[in-house]
Amino acid sequence: MFKLLLSLSVLLSPAVLSASEEAKDPYMNALVKELDRSFAGFRNAEKTPLYYLGYELTVSKYHYLSAKFGALDADSEQRGNKLDIDMRVNTMGLDNTHQVKGNMAWASSTQSQDLPVALEGDENALRARIWEYTDKAFKKAQENFTKVKMNKAVTAAEDDPSPDFSPAGAENFYETVELQAPDLAAWRERLKKHSARMAGYSFIYDSGVTVSYENENRYLVNSEGTRVKTGNNYITLTYYLTSRTTDGMELSRGEHYNTDSFAGLPSAGKVDADMDRSIAELKALKDAPVVEPYSGPAILKARAAGVYFHEIIGHRLEGHRQKLEDSGQTFAKKVGQKVTSDIITLYDDPNLTEFRGVPLRGHYRYDDEGVKARRVSLVENGVLKGFLMNRSPIRGFAASNGHGRRSSGLPTVARMGNLVMKASVTSTYPELRGQLIAECRKQNKPFGLVFEDISGGFTNTNRGGAQAFKVLPLLVYKVYTDGRPDEMVRGVDIVGTPITSFSKISAAADDDAVFNGTCGAESGWVPVSSVSPSVLISELEVEKSEKSQEKPPVLEPPLHDK
C-alpha cells in the first residue's frame, strides 16, 4: 500500500561550485578511494563474484519551528549523514537482489542500508566506516544470493525472465547546494502571532503553524565510474486547524506555502487572510451534512485531480510492478492499447523545476542509481506508451529512464517524480461545471460532486488484496441540477479500481495547478509533484469516510472561559 501526503517542502535553486571544490571534498575523496579499493578487493574474494558496487551518501541539515496557541511549541535542529551501499554479486542476469518468492519484494533485497557515518568530514574516519559497512554488505550479499538460488530451484519459473540489473553509462556532475539560514528570531515571533489568531475560536480544538527548512547534498559513486554530487534545499510554511462534529468526525482545514526562498513566502497579512478563510470553512463543515455513498458525475479540481492521477495510474506504471510475481501487473500487457480518453496525455519529467512559477517538489537531476533524470512518455492521446524505469529491466524495456528512487536505508525501485497530465481539448472551468450539470441530467442524477481540496490518498497494487485506490477529500460540494446553491458536504472518500476509473475521464478545464507532496512506498518516502487541470469524470464512486466514535470535548478550550 502506498500513501501520498501533503507537501512539507519544496526545491530551492542550487549554488554550483567549481570543479576545484570537488578535489577538496573529503566526502567525495573518501567514497571514491574506498570504492576503488573495495571493488578491486571484493571482486573475486568469493566463489560468487562482486560485479557492481555503489555508494550513496546523504549529508543533511534540518531546522523545524512550531507554534500553538500563541506560544512556541518546538524549535529543533538536526544534522545527519546516511550511507547506502548497493552491493551486487554474480551477474546482471541473476543476482542477490532477485525476488525470493514468498517474501515481500523488498525483503529479499539487502543492497541498501541506512547507516550513520562520521559527521566531521574527516576522510580517514569516513573511510574506516565505509570499509566496515562494505564488508558487512558483501557478506550479506553472498548469503542472500544463496537464498535466491535455492528459491529458484524449488519454485515455478517467472513470467518475465528479464535480468535483475541493467548497465548505465558513467555520469560526472558536481554541485554543492547551500542554504542561508533565515532570521530565526523574527520567524519565532511571526509564528506565535499566527498561531494566536486561530486560538480565538471555541470550535477549533487544535491548531498550529510551522516553518521548516532542510539542506541536503547527495553523493553518488559506483564501480561503473559515476561520480555525482547534487543537492536540494527544502522549505515550507504551513498552518492547520481541526475540529470534531457531534457524530465523532474529525475535520481539518489548512494551507501550505512552497517557495524557493524565505523572501518568497507570503506576507503575514496574506497568511492571516487565508487563515480567516480556512476558519470559515471549518465552521461550515461542522454543520455540513454527510454524503451517502454515491456513484455519478463529478469534477476533481486541479490539485485534487493531480492526486487522483498519482493514485489510479502513477504507481501502476512503475516498471518493477510489471515484473514482480506478487504484483497485480494491471497495465503490464497493455502497451499500445487505449486506456483512457483520447484527450489525455501523461508524462513524468523530474527535470522540471517549476510550473507557472510554482516550484516542483519532484524535481531531481540524477536518480538514486546515478542515472540522469529523463522525461518519460506514459500515455499519449489515451494510449499507453511506457513505464517509469529504474535499472531493473522488464519485458520490452531494457534500460533505466532515471526514475530509480528511495529514501535512505531502503532498496531503489521505480518511482514518480513530476507527473504531468495534459489535455488536448480544454474549456474554462465555468464551462466544465456546465458540462457536469449536463452529464448529471443525462444520467438522471439530481446532483454531481465537486472536490475542491484533498489531503492525499493511497493505493494497493498487490495480488493479495483488492487492487483499488482511495483518495481522501477535505472539501466537497454538491452541485444541483435544479439551480439550488452549491452545498458543502462532508464524510466521503473517493474509491475505485484503476482500469475502470481511468476510462471514465471525459473532459478537462484549462486551469492546470500543482500538487506538491511526499509519497510513501516500499522504497520509502520521496518528494513528488503532480500537475493537472480540473477534470470531469462521468462516473466516480464515493463511500463514507472513516470516523471515530469520540464525542467533542465536554468543556470549551480554557481560553474561552468567561
What are these regions, as identified by a protein language model?
Residues G362, K422-T500, N516-S523:
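Hydrophobic alpha-helical bundle architecture
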Residues D349-N351, M389-S392, S424, I454-G456:
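Histidine- and/or cysteine-centered catalytic micro-motif in compact active-site loops
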Residues K372-R374, L474-L475:
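Short loop/turn microsegments at loop-to-beta-strand junctions
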Residues K385-E439:
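C-terminal, non-catalytic macromolecule-binding modules
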Residues G254-H256, N390-S392, R490-V492:
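Residue-level structural signal for beta-strand termini and adjacent loop
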Residues L17-V371, E380-V383, G396, P446-F447, ...:
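Active-site bordering "gate/hinge" segments
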Residues K3-A15:
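Bacterial N-terminal signal peptides
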Residues G231, L388, M488-R490:
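Short linear motifs in exposed loops
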